[in-house]
UniProtKB/Swiss-Prot annotation:
Cross-referenced Pfam families: Insulin
Region of interest: C: 78-89
Region listing for A, in residue ranges: 90-110
PROSITE patterns: INSULIN
Native organism taxonomy: Eukaryota, Metazoa, Chordata, Craniata, Vertebrata
Protein name: Insulin-like growth factor 1
InterPro entries per the UniProt record, alphabetical: IGF-I (IPR022341), Insulin-like (IPR016179), Insulin-like_growth_factor (IPR022350), Insulin-like_sf (IPR036438), Insulin_CS (IPR022353), Insulin_family (IPR022352)
Main localization of the protein described in the UniProt heading: secreted
Annotated source species: Rattus norvegicus
Subunit structure: Forms a ternary complex with IGFR1 and ITGAV:ITGB3. Forms a ternary complex with IGFR1 and ITGA6:ITGB4. Forms a ternary complex with IGFBP3 and ALS.
Length: 153
């Protein structure tokens, strides 16, 4: 014997089906077209593979992500490394031939440059101090000058 469902459950199913039939009948054909278009858009974007960045699009994306820091096409390596490494892959290999995300793009950004802070007077060397007019004149006279004057050897 088959399973007998309760009366309230059957009534709910009938009412729901009738409600949906009325709603679909009331909807105009343009509404149905837009609904189908939305469903098609969502399903096609869900099945589409990840996009790749090549050429000018890759450069534009790097400029946007890295900003004024700039970027490298190959990953920067440490200095003084004498160990032979396998050939490096660059941003083109990682983002043009395969898809990459924002974190992968950020790996190719140049490091932030430290901001130049104002040096204190104590930290300045004596050669950084401006020379007075008298000091400049004394140095020039000790070396001699052009014309009839003699030069020191």
């Amino acid at each position: 014997m088959g399973k007998i469902s309760s009366l309230p459950t059957q009534l709910f199913k009938i009412c729901l089906c009738d409600f949906l039939k009325i709603k679909i009948h009331i909807m105009s054909s343009s509404h149905l077209f837009y609904l189908a278009l939305c469903l098609l858009t969502f399903t096609s974007s869900a099945t589409a593979g990840p996009e790749t960045l090549c050429g000018a699009e890759l450069v534009d994306a790097l400029q946007f992500v890295c900003g004024p820091r700039g970027f490298y096409f190959n990953k920067p390596t440490g200095y003084g490394s004498s160990i032979r490494r396998a050939p490096q892959t660059g941003i083109v290999d990682e983002c043009c031939f395969r898809s990459c995300d924002l974190r992968r793009l950020e790996m190719y950004c140049a490091p932030l440059k430290p901001t130049k802070s104002a040096r204190s007077i104590r930290a300045q060397r004596h050669t950084d101090m401006p020379k007075t007019q008298k000091e400049v004149h004394l140095k020039n006279t000790s070396r001699g000058s052009a014309g009839n004057k003699t030069y020191r050897m």
